[in-house]
Amino acid sequence: MLNKQTLISIEDALPGREQPMQIEDCHFVNQSSLTAPLAHHQQQILLGMGCFWGAERLFWQLDGVVSTSVGYAGGFTPNPTYEEVCTGKTGHTEVVRVVFDERVISLAQLLAVFWEKHDPTQGMRQGNDLGTQYRSAIYTYSQDQQEIADKSKLQYQQALEAELRSTITTEIVPAGPYYFAETYHQQYLAKNPDGYCGIGGTGVCFPPSLQG
């Protein structure tokens, strides 16, 4: 019997499919392209912080964020469906892909929001959402991003320890494939303002002097 709090092995993961998910390319909120190549002053990062509906809304509201989308990453099954991810048999976590203008907002500033707005100490869950798909994760696209993310984790761990909180369980590794979620998930809380939002932090602030 599958334990949804234990990551599945690649041997036991669902096979998936070759055909990518077909999505509407236009961002529902700011009309940006979800699939456009990065400009020279832009970066991307994948952030997992529980249910991706509420997480995405946090980031599209920030100055300097060019575009956001939601999808699946960190697992084994190619081009999974939401229903497959929910079984725990793909290895993926729900993530937000954030494309940002590094001239306006830094990765360190984005990560301060990431750390503060969810509980990164809960392992394979986030609040009432239970399963490996809700694990906390940062998937990076360069060595510089990896170093910034690792450093910010240490800084936030120190802030948590000062408040006698638990140990961070966030997975921080180089990004593998990113698979778009279905169109109805994209900018979900803009389309459904009264929809479910599971976002909730620890109440511990990231030290302002360290946000870069």
UniProtKB/Swiss-Prot annotation:
Belongs to the MsrA Met sulfoxide reductase family. InterPro entries: Met_Sox_Rdtase_MsrA_dom, Met_Sox_Rdtase_MsrA_sf, MsrA_MetSO_reductase. Has an important function as a repair enzyme for proteins that have been inactivated by oxidation. Catalyzes the reversible oxidation-reduction of methionine sulfoxide in proteins to methionine. This is Peptide methionine sulfoxide reductase MsrA. It catalyses: L-methionyl-[protein] + [thioredoxin]-disulfide + H2O = L-methionyl-(S)-S-oxide-[protein] + [thioredoxin]-dithiol; [thioredoxin]-disulfide + L-methionine + H2O = L-methionine (S)-S-oxide + [thioredoxin]-dithiol. GO terms for biological process: cellular response to oxidative stress; protein modification process. It holds the Pfam family PMSR. PANTHER family: MITOCHONDRIAL PEPTIDE METHIONINE SULFOXIDE REDUCTASE. The keyword rRNA processing does not apply. GO terms for cellular component: cytoplasm.
